[in-house]
């Protein structure tokens, strides 16, 4: 390594794939850039292995290096990420939402991603104005995107649509309109859940390969907006699901959305009551202390986009860093 590490650097990933055919506005980290980023991390920081991470959760000092984490239980993670990690002898933590495999349905948050990826923000907003105008705020407020997406490079229409569905509307309000929007975007043939997410067999395969598989809620709703009872249910359903299929709550919990506004002290209590030893959020800093000295139910993670070769690609199969 040419650069010494001073602690554990958790890094968060979502979509990692060679391309996104048919989704011209869909942001993802290209597989080529992911592999370049791994090579760069190997040179500059090194990686945290399974045993070192487990020792830290048991009370040991914070290990040095990059801790690789992957959210949402996406099909990308078994098809593309796992082979890349195995080829390099690397460890990763995979946090899985239980809803898709249990209900056979795509989560609302990913319906939004797919519709935006297919149509783009302006066309989605135009469809909403024509078909669900009653859900939209006053015209003068429609340009106000959420501060939660301030760090994203998406256009303002895309940020507004994400804010509307992920933060402003209730589950009941967004349910039917999202179904209709997705049906419109894909001309009546939207993706199937098993084409988008890990199934139970894939979860067991990750565990057999030595990866950590942990809980990431049931529906990926914003936890802080749910009742205390619903928050407890979200945590426990997810924990039970991953443990039924080779994972463990011992790998900790991962908050959906992850920003400070997305969870609350009530959420932290629910995670602790479920027996998870810690929980990951999103905050751009390293971990230098033992777990007992950290705020264990609000651990930080960096976004992979903040590092070299982390620029999002769109639609095609050419790595962003190669353009």
Label each region the model flagged:
Residues 1-69, 76, 107-116, 208, ...:
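C-terminal active-site subregion of NodB/CE4 polysaccharide deacetylases
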Residues 201-203, 207-208, 212-213, 217-228:
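Histidine/lysine/aspartate-rich catalytic loop segments that bind and position anionic ligands
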Residues 1-3, 82-87, 197-208:
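Short amphipathic alpha-helices and their capping/turn segments at secondary-structure boundaries
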Residues 105-209:
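Extended, charge-rich helix/loop segments that form flexible
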Residues 89-115:
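A short, conserved beta-to-alpha structural element at the edge of catalytic cores
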Residues 99-102, 220-221, 260:
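Solvent-exposed loop/turn segments at secondary-structure junctions
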Residues 11, 61-62, 74, 83-95, ...:
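CE4/NodB-like, metal-dependent polysaccharide N-deacetylase domain
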Residues 13-14, 97-99, 218, 284:
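Histidine-centered beta-alpha loop that forms part of the nucleotide-sugar donor binding/catalytic region
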